[in-house]
């Protein structure tokens, strides 16, 4: 039997450990809350990067331009079982534009959109093979000056990507080596967007737990 004083302490301890706020499930990364968490990635000869009215504008670099979100860890965003949604537009150029680098557990990978001449889609890198060489390689046509909606799902055993509502990547990552292609893309970790000799815009970046 628990005495009155002990019962009170037990109830207080239970309240402190079980009655906190529920875990956060959604982050709007281009909202005012995270305005100070974005910066240019600092790539060699990159174009101008601006953040205004909930949108990222990336001017063409020589060859690459990047935007980096540095608050992934401090904001306690997930590294698995989460989804990323955003819209990307290629304004000028004919290479990748809405390319996003993101965490997967203890690693990072990059979703290439419109690379290798304008149409290639895929994940870099799986088992040291980049998006043009592994099983995620695909092709899609992207018209300039149009918004293209993108959804990425990071699950325990697989990665899935939809562009314009169409499933374009569905790959198992169980037992696979996940990594980034060597070079300036590493400056976009833990999360960021990159273009290659291309002017682009990105908006509506939302991360949600699955």
Positions of predicted regions on the chain:
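Extracellular carbohydrate-recognition regions
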Residues: 21-42
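Short carbohydrate-recognition loop motifs
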Residues: 48-66
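Secretory/extracellular carbohydrate-interaction modules
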Residues: 63-126
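Beta-strand-rich interaction surfaces with strong enrichment in secreted/lumenal proteins
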Residues: 70-76, 136-142, 191-192
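Extracellular beta-strand elements of beta-rich domains used
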Residues: 86, 205-207
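Short, aromatic/His-centered strand-loop micro-motif at the edge of beta-sheets
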Residues: 127-149
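Localized edge beta-strand/strand-to-loop motifs within extracellular or lumenal beta-rich domains
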Residues: 146-160
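Flexible glycan-contacting loops in extracellular carbohydrate-active proteins
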Residues: 171-201
